Amino acid sequence: MKCLLLALGLALACAAQAIIVTQTMKGLDIQKVAGTWYSLAMAASDISLLDAQSAPLRVYVEELKPTPEGDLEILLQKWENGECAQKKIIAEKTKIPAVFKIDALNENKVLVLDTDYKKYLLFCMENSAEPEQSLACQCLVRTPEVDDEALEKFDKALKALPMHIRLSFNPTQLEEQCHV
């Protein structure tokens, strides 16, 4: 009985720890993700990360630019103080090709889950720091059109993650997301 209680206690302690994305893309070619992208869908572990137009992780990716050093420059737009602001984030390469380190938007990692390079890219931003662990993911597409295949892959990837809010955008919204 003592062993059962100990095992149960350990299981609960481990389950309450970090929100961890375990599946990232193998063999990411960072040069192939370069170019214009549109945020088709977003999801987050905490409703407050996306619920309002100016929510902390409600960002609209505009362009991905690999740097000569192998890092990834992310150009995005975000609502701040009632207007659209352009931001640039440098995601530093790590030993894992699909994982990047960032120090922006209160997040500390960008993880590429999947991409076909031509139509869609799925990624998550993770903050594993205590006590405010959080996870926000996006489905990016190359054109301002709804891509059902990309959305299916996004929904499949989210099944294993603790998401509590999900937003998706129609073609008009994709065109008008947040223009500077």
UniProtKB/Swiss-Prot annotation:
Main location: secreted
Family annotation (PROSITE patterns): LIPOCALIN (PS00213)
GO function term, MF aspect, one: retinol binding
Transmembrane segments: none
One Pfam family it belongs to: Lipocalin
Entry keyword annotation includes GTP-binding: no
Keywords: Disulfide bond, Milk protein, Retinol-binding, Secreted, Signal, Transport
Maturation and modification: Alternate disulfide bonds occur in equal amounts.
GO cellular component: extracellular region
SS bond list: 84-178, 124-137, 124-139
Similarity field: Belongs to the calycin superfamily. Lipocalin family.
Biological role stated in the UniProt entry: Primary component of whey, it binds retinol and is probably involved in the transport of that molecule.
Protein name, per record: Beta-lactoglobulin
Organism: Bubalus bubalis
